[in-house]
Amino acid sequence: MFNIKMTISVLLIALIVLLIIILVVFLYYKKQQPPKKVCKVDKDCGSGEHCVRGSCSSLSCLDAVKTDKRNIKIDSNISSCEFTPNFYRFMDTAADEQQEFGKTRHSIKITPSPSESHSPQEVCERYCSWGTDDCTGWEYDGNEKEGTCYIYNNPHHPVLKYGKNHVIALPRNHKHA
């Protein structure tokens, strides 16, 4: 009788130890995540993912901006943005001209010719893309026919505010992030 109780006790202890080992191993492997895929452009990532700071991510555009642009300040009225190949684009958004980032903008008047196939916004974006690495953003204020393009070259962290009919874009994965 004593041997049976002893055998049952040993089996219960062994079962408990085995369950604890399985639980620890399960929790350890659950915490382990596959390494993030390294990327340079969105095409390097899977469907629904974007390249954010050199890693593929499924973050929303607004969360990606906050990850990529450390210490950025965004007005609570701004609830979304969109990914473009080189920029995070915000509609109805402007830089706060009272802050360091907004104080040093340079204006460029854009009035495309009728034969030009690009919109003024596209011209503004290309100006920033083709410029030097010092372009830290562009802003367009106007309509589809004409407006003013502002180029930013200040590495200070942007402060964005609501601005009707303004479009602002910040470079993705930029050296001044």
Curated annotation (Swiss-Prot):
The keyword Lipoprotein does not apply. Residues 1-7 are intravirion. One of its GO terms (cellular component) is virion membrane. The chain crosses the membrane at residues 8-28. Keywords: Early protein, Host cell membrane, Host membrane, Membrane, Transmembrane, Transmembrane helix, Virion. It is found in: Virion membrane; Host cell membrane. Induction: Expressed in the late phase of the viral replicative cycle. Residues 29-177 are virion surface. The keyword Transmembrane helix applies. Coiled coil: none annotated. It is a single-pass membrane protein. Belongs to the asfivirus inner membrane protein p22 family. This is Inner membrane protein p22.
